[in-house]
Amino acid sequence: MKVFESRLDIKSEQYKKRRSYLLQLLSELNLRKKQVIAQAPEAVEKLLKRGKYPAREKIRRVLDPGEEPLEIGLFAAWEMYHDIPGGYPSAGTIVQIGRVSGKLAVIVANDPLVKSGAWVEITCKKNLRAQEIAMDNRLPII
């Protein structure tokens, strides 16, 4: 097998600047991800008292043990709907791809902690995209 050698100079100033910039961008992305996923503890507690679960927890319970799902559209509705207090994180619906009984599936769950699961235009688009991904990849959708 042919070995490819890199000409990347990790000691160059250009590399160091670009690496630093990339790490800064990754840090911002991770911060935004935490903001989108964060849920008010009192709202979660209230939901649990009613015998219900947040959307990501519902999906986690359906997935095979130890399965790490791929989330689609985490940033849907990011910085949209400024007129709605709290915005519409992930467009109020969670879409993940993961294994259920050993087979890949697209799993969709409406988030009851985002405006009680109400839909807006972008929620419809996200659900249609989930169906499209499932059809294109011949995956069941749950």
Segments from the language model and where they lie:
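Terminal-region recognition feature
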Residues: 1-142
